[in-house]
Amino acid sequence: MTAAVTSAQTPSFEVASIKKNTSRPSDPEARTLGCHGTNSHSPLMTIPLGRCTTRFEPLRLVIALAYDIPPSLLYPYDGKILSGPDWINSEIYDIEAKAEGPTTEAQLKLMLQDLLADRFKLKLHRESREMPVYALVTTKAGIKFPAAPKDRECGEQVRRDHRYELGATSLAGQCHGFVPDRGALTGRSVNMNDFAEMLSIWAGRVVIDKTGADGLFDIKMPPVISALQDVVALERKESAIAGARGDAGPAGARVLVDSRPTVFNALDQFGLKLESTKGPVDVLVIDSIQKPSEN
């Protein structure tokens, strides 16, 4: 069974443009990759609401965006978490896709899946493979995050509606939601499985909840060194647009990164730790994909 077809209720883009890009950005900040729902809010957003936009990014990262694979997991697993032909790592397509009406980020990603299936004839399937992972476990001190207020409404519908709206500056009304900000992380009414999923971005491996803890927590994590920061440097070196910024980045940014604790150090103060082990990891295998024709 392929994953090329999504739900019949998935809305479609009103306008979608796909153009091959063979140039390099003069400004590294010109690189763009994201989908933002019409209910997202952030002063840092450069993508208009209700759109998916990619610029100067290899197709592999676009597919990863559509199927919710964090970029920080692509390189540590050496391509095994998203396998396909070599050209998806080097060919760059700028995509601008605008939704017709109000949409969430989760809906936009489903719409992007449909767009990739239509224009790139993308067909893929999911598999579960045994791979290195981290287990999130408690220390003897126990979890130090405060329990979330019990009178807060946090059903599964709320989780589906807000889980992907990571750009929000306010968590009012949200549950199972996170707001990353310059390496720090705030979570409102999240369980340990939610937290493990988010930690995968920082740790560079899939994190599986093994705490056995029930209930919801309000989480406030300090800025940490993210595996994604190292991945971005590596990707800039290996991709077709390498050299646009340089491996080390601005000297000031390097000092800032070096001053932060790792996610492993930061977790200890909250009564948690990550243990290296093996476990099931969901991977995407591309069965077929074609280079699209120009618009």
Task: Describe every region a protein language model picked out.
Residues 1-295:
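Beta-strand-rich assembly/attachment modules of structural machines
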